[in-house]
């Protein structure tokens, strides 16, 4: 039974080892494409196993497979697959055709899937470190670029600090509760004598460690430099799948064992949410690099997502999951458009480089405008519905704290709309200083168009995603 529950993770890890052996044995630059295709195949097989696999608790209560884990894992696999597709042309063009890229992405994905199914703090930490160590290397994958090496080093140093905070919090929880198992913690906290100030401090440290992984303010200091310095496909990857995994881990960690003490951690999450929304909205206004703009944008988006977590209700969890689905596709679509910004063999990253794109590159301008409107929360784009369900959950909770969160969220969305619409203004109303961009690679076109279709037409078919999110929320609160 244990092996059946973890079959997606086991199969994906074994596939990673096989692909690694293939890459090492052949060790030819042209085999990078083969390894990437094998990785995508492994992701597909893992996705099928995840959907059709058994549900339950295994490995002596340390691993859980439930509808919540299934939905989040499929979202993680989607984000990882898109990142591998985006890397195909980019790595070849920048002399980074090495088989290690898809392999590292694969092992990072294994760690994320373990995190999502963790029902014990030790399992959680093992998955977190497997994910993080692979991403540290990916951030510095462009070895010949100084800023990429700087991004990897900065992410590693600050990530180690965050892991230390998380471990310290776990040790406090274990010291005061005597267990690291989520179900045992929930039973212990059901009694009035089960809570203590030391346990609360431990939970706060755990929240701080996980907030770093989702780049929520004030634990966001690594985000702008790492986003800008990392290769763009890596930025697209770390901006989606790892954040989905980390915020899902926050959900399972806080809702499953600590739902009985919601009041004690709700204010901490609400504070992080407010700071993230405000800082993300204000700091992005003056950015000239579109990758740094996306970094601050992601900080704000995580603030909006945390509104659903602060609600702590089924509606809040459902809203958060819907938000994550919309976030992944509009984010990866935006980075696909950034990868299409290339002239004379040089990758461009400035907002000003988009000047006049509405006339010189109408397809790129249209797709990027769709993603900008969605991130701003303008209907009928998918980003509007993501924010709508999160804010509705906060309002329906009926608490003054959550009402305040919803109001701040709406206000910061209005502020944030300025820098998203500024990109649209530059594309359609500024004069073009240079000619059109180079022809799009097929891989970039597929991701950009597919993400745009999902983002623009989400309102026509929301039912399957709403139903899956509702089922996942019920499973988490069960």
UniProtKB/Swiss-Prot annotation:
Domain of life: Bacteria
Keywords: Cell inner membrane, Cell membrane, Membrane, NAD, Quinone, Translocase, Transmembrane, Transmembrane helix, Transport, Ubiquinone
UniProt topology in membrane: Multi-pass membrane protein
tRNA processing listed as a keyword: no
Membrane-crossing residue ranges in chain numbering: 5-25, 37-57, 68-88, 99-119, 121-141, 156-176, 199-219, 231-251, 268-288, 293-313, 320-340, 365-385, 401-421, 446-466
Subcellular location: Cell inner membrane
Documented EC number(s): 7.1.1.-
Reaction(s) this enzyme catalyzes, per UniProt: a quinone + NADH + 5 H(+)(in) = a quinol + NAD(+) + 4 H(+)(out)
Gene Ontology CC annotation, any one: plasma membrane
Top enzyme class: translocase
Record GO biological process: ATP synthesis coupled electron transport
GO molecular function: NADH dehydrogenase (ubiquinone) activity; NADH:ubiquinone reductase (non-electrogenic) activity; quinone binding
InterPro entries: NADH-Q_OxRdtase_suN/2, ND/Mrp_TM
Function summary: NDH-1 shuttles electrons from NADH, via FMN and iron-sulfur (Fe-S) centers, to quinones in the respiratory chain. The immediate electron acceptor for the enzyme in this species is believed to be ubiquinone. Couples the redox reaction to proton translocation (for every two electrons transferred, four hydrogen ions are translocated across the cytoplasmic membrane), and thus conserves the redox energy in a proton gradient.
Assembly: NDH-1 is composed of 14 different subunits. Subunits NuoA, H, J, K, L, M, N constitute the membrane sector of the complex.
PANTHER family from the UniProt entry: NADH DEHYDROGENASE
Family of this protein: Belongs to the complex I subunit 2 family.
Name this polypeptide is given: NADH-quinone oxidoreductase subunit N
Lineage: Bacteria, Pseudomonadati, Pseudomonadota, Alphaproteobacteria, Acetobacterales
């Amino acid at each position: 039974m244990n092996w059946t529950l973890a079959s997606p993770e086991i199969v994906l890890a074994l596939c990673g080892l096989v692909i690694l052996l293939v890459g090492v044995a052949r060790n030819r630059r042209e085999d990078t494409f083969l390894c990437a295709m094998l990785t995508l195949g492994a992701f597909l097989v893992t996705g099928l196993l995840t959907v059709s696999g058994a549900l339950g608790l295994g490995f002596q209560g340390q691993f859980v497979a439930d509808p919540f884990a299934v939905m989040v894992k499929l979202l993680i696999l989607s984000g990882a697959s898109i990142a591998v597709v985006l890397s195909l042309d980019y790595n070849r063009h920048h002399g980074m055709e090495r088989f290690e890229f898809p392999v590292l992405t694969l092992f990072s994905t294994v760690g994320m899937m373990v995190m999502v199914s963790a029902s014990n703090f030790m399992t959680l930490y093992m998955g977190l470190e497997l994910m993080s160590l692979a991403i540290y290397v990916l951030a510095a994958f462009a070895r010949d670029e100084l800023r990429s090496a700087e991004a990897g080093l900065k992410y590693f140093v600050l990530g180690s600090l965050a892991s230390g905070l998380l471990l310290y919090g776990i040790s406090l929880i274990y010291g005061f509760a005597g267990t690291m198992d989520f179900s045992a913690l929930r039973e212990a906290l059901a009694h009035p004598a089960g809570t203590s100030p030391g346990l609360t401090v431990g939970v706060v440290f755990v929240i701080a460690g996980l907030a770093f992984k989702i780049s929520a303010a004030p634990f966001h200091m690594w985000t702008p430099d790492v986003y800008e310095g990392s290769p763009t496909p890596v930025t697209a990857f770390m901006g989606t799948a790892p954040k989905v995994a980390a915020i899902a881990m926050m959900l399972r960690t806080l809702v499953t064992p600590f739902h009985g003490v919601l009041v004690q951690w709700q204010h901490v999450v609400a504070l992080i949410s407010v700071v993230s929304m405000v800082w993300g909205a204000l700091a992005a206004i003056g950015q000239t690099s579109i990758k740094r703009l996306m970094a601050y944008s992601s900080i704000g988006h995580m603030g909006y997502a945390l509104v659903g977590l602060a609600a702590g209700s089924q509606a809040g969890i459902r809203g958060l999951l819907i938000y994550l689905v919309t976030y992944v596709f509009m984010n990866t679509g935006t980075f696909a458009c950034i990868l299409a910004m290339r002239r004379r063999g040089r990758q461009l990253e400035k907002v000003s480089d988009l000047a006049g794109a509405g006339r010189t590159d109408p397809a790129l301008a249209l797709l990027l405008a769709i993603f900008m409107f969605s991130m701003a929360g303008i209907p009928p784009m998918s980003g509007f519905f993501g924010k709508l369900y999160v804010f509705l959950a906060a309002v329906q909770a009926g608490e003054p704290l959550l009402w305040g969160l919803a109001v701040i969220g709406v206000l910061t969305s209005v502020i944030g709309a300025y820098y998203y619409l500024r990109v649209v203004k530059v594309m359609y109303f500024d004069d073009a200083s240079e000619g059109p961009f180079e022809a799009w690679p097929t891989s970039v076109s597929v991701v950009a168009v597919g993400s745009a279709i999902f983002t623009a037409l989400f309102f026509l078919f929301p039912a399957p995603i709403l139903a899956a999110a509702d089922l996942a929320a019920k499973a988490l609160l069960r």
